Amino acid sequence: MDMPLKIWFVESGHSERKLLGRSAEEYLLREFSAFDTEKVVSEGECRFEEGRLDVVIPLDMPLVTVGDVERGAEYVKKHSLGVLALGGAASGAKIVRSEGGRSGYFISSPHFVKVDSAKNVRLVYNQLKERITDRLLEAGVFVFDPANTVVDDTVRIAAGAEILPFCKIEGDTVIEAGASVEGSHISDCRIEGGAKVVMSHLADTRVGAGSTVGPFARLRGAVVGKGCRVGDFVEIKNSVFGDGAKSAHLAYIGDADVGGGTNVGCGTVFCNYDGKWKHRTSVGRDCFIGANVNLVAPVSLGDGAFVAAGTTVTQDVEKDGFAIGRSRQVNKTRRAEGAEKDFGGGDKA
């Protein structure tokens, strides 16, 4: 007759160590969620009972699986053992059958490893990383180079998504089917279907379907709409970037609401900080912001507004308005009439 299992989790000083998005303790509690479990401060608090198998597992062994315990339980019953040490006597993990039997036996397993040293943390980290990657591959996620890809256990990636080399994806991140991420650090983000992120850093950001980000973009606290382009060396912070908006390169968009279809030119800066407070900028739909423009917040641009290159905007621009605020170009003669032309600036040989 099968004997029921009781799992005793013994608290440990290393149980809160974070590995790939979860603590060592969280991995164990999830793995054995279908079992009768109880947490205790020390092994002395365990209450072993006749007629069942009591399993003692320190909470700093995140690699232990249900299969490991079930194989150990079968070994105990088959060989009529009273105590079976799991992973060796020093591990602290064991299976106890209270009605007695032979003791002193142990079963070796690479999973009964504590995260109590730098060496063990490395071993456990890499095994967890491999498990996560295998699970993604089995689910239909294209992970092209697992050795150079790090994905937290908390991340959700749909079948059909592509994870290219040199990515670190962590936190509460969701990547939808058809999205592609390459060489990027992504934390607590949602990347919608068809979006492409290349060599960029994203945190607390949503990237809409069909949008492209990077290379070398930084987005934090941003909502990027559908079909947008966020190019190289563009930073978007605490801002909404409407559907179809574009910023191809070299811009800072901070504390702003940018309407759909708007173009933000190269070198544009949303000047959001006055030295003490942050202020927001509102840009309407289908605006054109030329190169090297400064938008000094708080300021707003109406739908269809046009801002000429090199302008510093300090006043609101009305709908379909045109703003230009730069020094007038003056062309002057470079030399007096009849003087010898000398662009070198030095004596002639």
Feature names for model-found ranges:
Residues E11-S12, S103, I107, G140-F142, ...:
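Generic signal for short, ordered secondary-structure residues
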Residues F32, V197-A349:
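Glycine-rich hexapeptide-repeat left-handed beta-helix
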Residues V151-G231:
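Acidic, glycine-rich loop-and-beta core segments that form the ion-binding/anion-interacting portion
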Residues M1-N148, D153-V155, G160, F166, ...:
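Terminal amphipathic alpha-helical/low-complexity segments used for targeting or macromolecular assembly
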Residues V66-D68, I191, V207, V317:
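Short glycine-/acidic-enriched loop or helix-start segments at secondary-structure transitions
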Residues E11-H14, K18, P110-H111, T149, ...:
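Residues at structural and domain junctions
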